[in-house]
Amino acid sequence: MKKKIWLSSPHMGGTEQKYVQEAFDTNWVAPLGPNVNEFENGLQGYLTKNKQVTALSSGTAAIHIALILAGVTKGDEVLCQSFTFSASANPIVYVGAKPVFIDSESDTWNMCPVLLENAILD
């Protein structure tokens, strides 16, 4: 195949480029900095004043922490979309649980609700 078909075309607009350049210019590339602090404070204010908000480095880290906080442990089964990047399932394995992959609908690419129901009842 000579021509790549992108599922989602890569794109970075002017705003993203500005913030990336600002991070390099101020040497706040990782792990934290004023943009992360502003994001956390803004999200905390939007959601609630009584809870803490923490920005993480990736969706994988967020799923990992969510599984731990939900009490998922070794031997548990966790339903997982089959049409995904491996990083969606890796945290399930990190906590010792078993990913159970649910296939997608061909017209939406979303998890098939019928197959989801079957997996829950199984």
Regions found by a protein language model. Give the residues of each.
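PLP-dependent aminotransferase-like
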Residues: 68, 72-122
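Alpha-helix N-cap/helix-start motif at coil-to-helix transitions, marked by capping-box chemistry
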Residues: 10-14, 37, 86
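Phosphate-binding glycine-rich loop
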Residues: 32-77, 91-93, 101-103
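An amphipathic alpha-helix/helix-turn recognition signal
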Residues: 18, 57, 61, 83-87
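N-terminal "arm"/small-domain region of PLP-dependent enzymes with the aminotransferase-like
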Residues: 1-30
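Aromatic-acidic/polar surface patches that form glycan- and anion
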Residues: 10-13, 32, 55, 109
